[in-house]
UniProtKB/Swiss-Prot annotation:
GO terms for molecular function: ATP binding; ATP-dependent DNA damage sensor activity; damaged DNA binding; mismatched DNA binding. Belongs to the DNA mismatch repair MutS family. It comes from the Bacteria. SUPFAM superfamilies: DNA repair protein MutS, domain I, DNA repair protein MutS, domain II, DNA repair protein MutS, domain III, P-loop containing nucleoside triphosphate hydrolases. This is DNA mismatch repair protein MutS. HAMAP family: MutS (MF_00096). Disulfide bonds: none annotated. GO terms for biological process: mismatch repair.
């Protein structure tokens, strides 16, 4: 509670004492304390929350020494405010009133009913529909690291074991966890500290060792997962995994205050089953977010995602995160995609029916968590209604995956019939206001409902009868929550009130009465309304419990529908963008004809996208050196090769006319210069870190794409490093990986002379006088020209600078140097000042630029650095 407030507990009111007790048990949470129709927040929590939620901070006992900081919001707005606290990494304890205040003797009893944390969000309105929200536990033990992670909204629960910390770090980055549990002391380890410091809003908490205790963890696992399934996973010899999984389950039970039936399946996954993509590769290839603005639009996922269900979107994201390495599994996906693609009407109908299916995975989770309302059950019913149609559509399918899906879909007719009979088609959101159960489902509910309805009719009849009896035409019978039913007569007519009328309330212009007849019927009607609402609530809970009993069946079908939607999405994309079905095998050859970049080709390019071929193997075409000017398309080309390989291994068709992909185990990238100045790393250090990761982990089955290695340091250092890296990757005694190496060091083309397996390619350029046109075509052979000056002209560098640069370049190519290596022309050329009368003291910016250019030793400047200088000069010339 942080009571600087150092207020003695004894001095607090009973309600605040109750709050203090709750806060003492949940010190790491912001406590939402239910008081009537509001959640109130006190003390330091209030100060923190008011800033995050942008709500007024006030105080109890304002102006007094014992004032208590206070803020709050209406309970019905919790779905708006709680996510804001969670987004900032806080945990929130929701403390509810658990008895009717009218019946309470003394202070109302309250209890924490759930704890919401970044990794344990159950409100689907506050989750990204097509992304998982994972809570993870990490348990380092001896030479193993156990990892377990759970999405509580779907029940997806996975585990893995790592003996190599670098593979483990790759997994941490891959899954973008929202919250990580570690044993006390483990948070000090470098790998977790580094991870927690990344910009991924991940909460990292240390827990007592008892959470990871093997025996209690195993017992807890056996409570959730069938014994046979646990034995099949072979967890007996994986104590680190058992400890991590048990910690997750204990934390879930403590925060949700119950055992959750939708957590009933544990899945083991191994990095060996998938193409490994580290954080750098995913960023550089822009799989899920663009580098420039961190948006989904413009990423590979945005191109491939034509899913029509949330669960299909999550499945597609998983496939993209974890491409396969088993050709048979890849071929099974490709065959299903091909079958859906081939039949336009089938594909259209399939996607139309799927679009009417709700997120059954998260609906099952809400039912298991006890938070599903009437609308959730109607969404489930609507989804179940479409299952027979889907089964019928898939009845004649030929591919293994579609056949398996068709066989496995459980229509759950019994559950559909129950919801259809019991729940109104348009139920209210809340469960206690009535109107949720259909007429005819329950006799007792109907009796109470009709009594309520008929009672209202009786009231109308009473009003008419009393008007006639009293002769007061303005008499009316009404109702309010405070006084109940009443007979209202205006002040002018109050003298006409019969003797059996008992005054109930006096208003400015009227008197309100009740008589014995109205009093008796009031008790009957009001009691019937209350009992009817209570009966409907009880009936709904029974229906929801029946649905909860079928959670496993729901989840099994939802899993199949997610697969089906992801397959249909890939088929839709393949047809829409004219992709081909790749041949995938275990050979070493990668051969792509007329390949395109799947994202770049979708952009509005004036001249259209220029496709290119590639041949890679582990022999004569092992290492491709690609030279050419900046902006010509080297980076796009090497990226597109990596993306096509990745797409093929996830089971997608690919943007080419023909493709044969020999499976790769990892894709490594070194593209661009992403500074990490926040972490104290220079551009060159980032580059060398990424290169080191590649050289330490690449194998002969890896695909490596490198762009401009060595450019972050001096020319000779950079060239030396680039050359040595190329040799190391090429040499089979070291790595021998299939590699595309884009570089501005044209000297590297000489590698092809030094050994076999190297191939030189360059980007074709058409020269037109002093100008160039990028043809974007990859052609055999190297080039020793960078066209830096022409690129500078395209970039808009002033013509005077371009002309002067051309003069200096001509001089350099003639080798006209003085004894200290400075071009004579650069030092001695006389310039015409633009303003002859201006003194040097007031030299113009344009003249300063030309002066700097004249003094430049161009022999020591590479084209890439020259371009940066020219861009700087251009900015200064524009400003000056």
């Amino acid at each position: 509670m942080g009571m600087k407030e150092s207020m003695e507990i004894s001095s607090l009111t009973p309600a605040m004492k109750q709050y203090a007790e709750v806060k003492a048990l949940h010190k790491d949470c912001i406590v939402l304390f239910r008081m009537g129709d509001f959640y109130e927040i006190f003390f330091e929590d209030a100060v923190t929350a008011s800033k995050i939620l942008d709500i007024t901070l006030t105080s109890r006992n304002k102006g007094k020494e014992d004032s208590i900081p206070l803020c709050g919001f209406p309970y019905h707005a919790s779905s708006t405010y709680i996510p804001k606290l969670i987004e900032k990494g806080f945990k929130v304890a929701v403390c509810e009133q658990i008895e009717d205040p009218k019946l309470a003797k003394g202070v109302v009893r309250r209890e924490v009913v759930r704890i919401v944390t970044p990794g344990l969000v159950v409100d689907t309105a506050n989750l990204h529909a097509k992304e998982n929200n994972f809570l993870a536990a990490v348990f380092p033990l001896e030479h193993h690291i156990g990892l377990a992670f759970l999405d509580i909204s779907t029940g997806e629960f996975r585990v893995s074991d790592f003996q190599d910390i670098r593979f483990f770090e790759t997994e941490l980055a891959a899954l973008d966890f929202r919250e990580i549990m570690v044993p006390q002391g483990s948070g000090k380890q470098g790998f977790l500290k580094a991870f927690a410091g990344r910009e991924n809003s991940c909460r990292l908490d240390e827990f007592p060792d008892e959470y990871f205790d093997r025996e209690s963890a195993l017992g807890r696992l056996q409570d959730y997962i069938r014994k046979e399934d646990l034995e099949d996973l072979g967890l007996k010899d994986c104590p680190a995994v058992i400890g991590a999984a048990g910690a997750v389950l204990r934390y879930v039970e403590e925060t949700q205050k119950s055992r959750l039936t939708h957590i009933n399946r544990l899945q083991w996954y191994s990095a060996a089953e998938y193409l490994v993509l580290d954080e750098t590769a995913k960023r550089n290839l822009e799989l899920f977010k663009t580098i420039q603005d961190n948006r989904t639009a413009g990423s590979l996922f945005s191109v491939l995602d034509e899913t029509v269900t949330a669960m299909g979107g999550r499945r597609l994201r998983w496939w993209l995160n974890y491409p396969l390495v088993d050709p048979e599994k890849i071929k099974a996906r490709l065959a299903a995609v091909a079958e859906i693609r081939e039949n336009h009407l089938f594909r259209e109908n399939l996607r139309k029916v799927l679009s009417e299916v709700y997120d059954m995975e998260r609906l099952a989770g809400r039912i298991a968590l006890g938070v599903a309302n009437g609308r959730d059950l109607i969404a489930l019913k609507q989804s179940l209604k479409n299952l027979p149609v889907l089964k019928n559509l898939l009845a004649d399918s030929n591919s293994f995956m579609l056949d398996r899906i068709q066989d496995g879909i459980d229509e759950l007719p019994d559950l559909y019939d129950l919801i259809e009979k019991a729940i109104c088609d348009s139920p209210p959101v809340t469960l206690r206001e009535g109107g949720i159960i259909k007429e005819g489902y329950d006799e007792e509910r109907d009796r109470l409902f009709f009594m309520t309805r008929d009672g209202r009719r009786w009231i109308a009849a009473l009003e008419e009868k009393e008007r006639k009896r009293t002769g007061i035409s303005s008499l009316k019978v009404g109702f309010n929550n405070v006084f109940g039913y009443y007979i209202e007569i205006s002040k002018a007519n109050s003298a006409l009130a019969p003797e059996d009328y008992v005054r109930k309330q006096t208003l400015v212009n009227a008197e309100r009465y009740i008589n014995q007849e109205l009093k008796e019927y009031e008790a009957t009607v009001l009691n019937a309304e209350t009992r009817c609402r209570e009966r409907e609530y009880d009936l709904f809970m029974q229906v929801r419990e029946c649905a909860a009993a079928e959670i496993t069946r729901m989840q099994a079908t939802a899993t199949l529908l997610a697969d089906l939607d992801a397959l249909a999405s890939l088929a839709e994309v393949a047809e829409k963008y004219n992709y081909c079905c790749p041949v995938v095998d275990l050979e070493d050859r990668i051969e792509i004809d007329v390949g395109r970049h799947p994202v770049v080709e979708r952009m509005s390019l004036r001249d259209g996208f220029v496709p290119n071929d590639v041949v890679l193997d582990t022999d004569e075409n092992r290492f491709l050196v690609i030279t050419g000017p900046n902006m010509a398309g080297k980076s796009t080309y090497i990226r597109q090769v990596a993306l096509i390989v990745l797409m093929a291994q996830m089971g997608s068709f690919v943007p080419s006319s023909r493709a044969r992909i020999g499976v790769v185990d990892r894709i490594f990238t070194r593209i661009g210069a992403a500074d990490s100045l926040i972490r104290g790393q220079s551009t060159f250090m980032v580059e060398m870190n990424e290169v080191a990761q590649i050289l330490c982990h690449a194998t002969g089955r890896s695909l490596v794409i490198l762009d401009e290695v060595g450019r972050g340091t001096s020319t000779f250092d950079g060239l030396s490093i680039a050359w040595a890296v190329a040799e190391y990757l090429h040499d089979k005694n070291w790595i021998g990986a299939r590699t595309l190496f884009a570089t501005h060091y044209h000297q590297l083309t000489e590698l092809a002379v030094a050994g076999t397996g190297y191939r030189n390619y360059n980007i074709a350029v058409k020269e037109w006088g002093d100008r160039i046109i990028f043809l974007r075509k990859i052609v055999p052979g190297g080039t020793n020209r960078s066209y830096g000056i022409q690129v500078a002209r395209i970039a808009g560098v002033p013509e005077e600078v371009i002309v002067r640069a051309r003069e200096i370049l001509d001089n350099l190519e003639k080798g006209e140097m003085d004894e200290v290596g400075m071009p004579r022309i650069a030092r001695s050329r006389k310039r015409k000042p633009r303003n002859p009368g201006q003194l040097n003291l007031f030299m113009s910016e344009r003249e300063r630029v030309i002066e700097e250019l004249a003094a430049l030793n161009i022999s020591r400047v590479e084209p890439h650095d020259a371009l940066n200088m020219m861009l700087n000069w251009q900015e200064r010339l524009k400003e000056g």
